[in-house]
Amino acid sequence: MKKRLPLLLTALCFLLCAAPLAGCTPAEEDVYGPTEKPGYPCENDEYTYLIHPESGEVTITSYLGTAEEVVVPAELDGYPVTAIQYFTIRPAAKALVKSVVLPDGLTEIGRIAFCGSALEEIEIPDSVERIGPDAFIGTPWLDAQTDEFIIVGDGVLIGCSLSEAESGAEADAPPTEMRIPNGVKHICLSFSEEPEGTYAVFIPSGVRSIGDYAFSRMNIASLSFEEGVREIGAHAFDGALHIEALELPDSLLYIGDGAFRGNESLRRIVLGKHTKHIGNYAFSSCESLISVDGLSGAARIGAYAFLYTPYFNNLTQEFVILGDGVLVAYNGRDKDVVVPEGVKSIVDAFSGKPIESVTLPSTLRSIDDYAFSYATALESVRFSAGCAPTSVGSYAFAGCTALRTVELPSSVTRIGDYAFSECAALREITLPKDLRSLGRAAFQSCTALTALTLPASLNEIGSYAFKSCPALKRIDLPDSVYALGSGAFMGCEQLTSARLPAKLTYIPDCLFLLCTRLQAVTMPEAVERIEAQAFQQCEALEEIAVPEACRDIGMSAFAGTPFLRRLHERDGAFAVLNRVLVGYDGDASEIVVPDGVERVMTMFSNYNAYEAALITSIVFPDSVTEIGELTLHGCHSLTTLTFGDGLRIVPEIKVSIRNMQAITLGRGCAYISPNAFFFSEDNACTFVVPEGSYAARWASEKAYLHRIATYE
């Protein structure tokens, strides 16, 4: 059954609620905590979305249309739609969408999905289990909510009303009882303003997860749980507790990053028997904490989990091992360190330590976040026989400026964000044959790295993965790669050739930006989209075969390349590639964009800014359906501007109408961005608009600032 809600609240969903976990007895196969799903971006006329090949699911990332009522499809490209993120992030959608019907099977509504939009009505199916931060803040939907507890989807609590009379706001008032109602499974709660007074919070047995930041703005004098909670999200109780002792339920499996950070009164913690994961900074800055019981079962204890606590400061042994073999600190003085057998994971134990070499034990199964970060004297890492870590965490070796070579075991399948960033001496690294994911900026600023072989198992390369690796000369991406991040090879000045995966459907923004010696790129026929600045300033790139099916080419994609100059030599002033205008290089003061052009994302760049300033008139034909925000950048002398009937959305082109005489809007115009035109009271501009159209209604609202003329 779906719920059609009017909406608002004093409190509302903030950060991601966790996936549901049925039952109260933890099982070994349970999946808990947030998960990241790699995917490749796609686009149709209505949506941008990610397809996740491993799970066979789709996440919608934005709505491109202009309809007031939207029915979200249950499938895209044959895959079920299970998540929505940033749905109304685009200005047109934010202003126009008033009603949304979400499909059965949807499990997640992501952060700021409808934030600040005109949404008045929404159908949320019972399948929804997660609702992210600020998902509905600033919408009429929220403003209409009157229930004390607002519960949607599969028992997701997104808000509650706490009046001053109920809040125990008086200085001597006892804590106000806050009992989460029965039927709630997931608490995705936060408040637009900090509730006054103190509270006694009771979490009943039906609750399975507490979302990020859920109680972080409250003052809690008492907190009690019944068995059942499996997950506490990031910063859920950050700075909120005014208690000395905390006992967590045995059902609890996962404690997120910073979940209990900064609770200065907290002296003693008793963890549940089944707690497996304690996130980064989970109990950091609990300045009174002296006792932690129940750590023995924890397989993962995050970086700096107990930083700035008396409890951690009193752990003075050479190797501080907590939980199930987690090395959290090294207090020794040896420069050549042999980590003892029995250690299964290493977090920030060697961060900033003056060690020169380390030998890792056969029992090691993960190198976690910040493990050796900024150990600037570290030259070598040895893996004992049988040592089989499956992952290298974020910042694990970041800033290890003396590290020259690394041969990772074949067991490693994931390298985290910034894992080897700023390893300035790193010349060679052997990547494991089963590696599947390279994180964001994983090798950024490895200035000595000349070559590496990417394994055939690799699926995902994060944004800026090899940014500013000036010695890297060649890169071959295996055909297994389907997710490629922005600027992955940006600033690789010595890179001369690159081969892209055969099934890659897009070239991400800034991919080869400032690769000044890049001469040859093998682009697959599957590519349908080249994003902004993808090849900008590739000063040696004279030829590149762009597939005919590629009709979406972003702003300045080829700016500053010989390839663009050759297009101008072939086409004249207007460089057109697959019906996309990719550049203008002429000296006329009045411009008529050629008929047949469908997209205009770039006309003028820094190289012809002078010519842009001389333009007095531009006409876009009916064939143009999209223009970029910077299309008219630098056109300070414009007096007339004409948009054809094909343009649906006038983006934030930021045109001043002070000197304008006439602006003509076409019949297809469905939305004009707030910053499309800058108005002033002393102007003589006339807006020429179709009778009875959206453009006519828009112009009439600002009639005191300009003149209006209509046409049929």
Residue spans of the language-model regions?
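Short secondary-structure subsegments characteristic of cysteine-rich extracellular domains
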Residues: Y86-A92
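Structural signature of tandem-repeat unit edges
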Residues: E46-S55, G65-T82, A93-E108, G116-R130, ...
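Consensus positions within tandem repeat domains that build extended binding/scaffold surfaces
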Residues: F87, R111-A113, P133-A135, S190, ...
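Acidic, glycine/polar-enriched metal-coordinating patches/loops
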Residues: F677-S680, K702
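Bacterial N-terminal signal peptides
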Residues: T10-P20
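Bacterial N-terminal signal peptides that target proteins for export
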Residues: M1-L9
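Sec-dependent signal peptide cleavage junction
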Residues: A18-K37
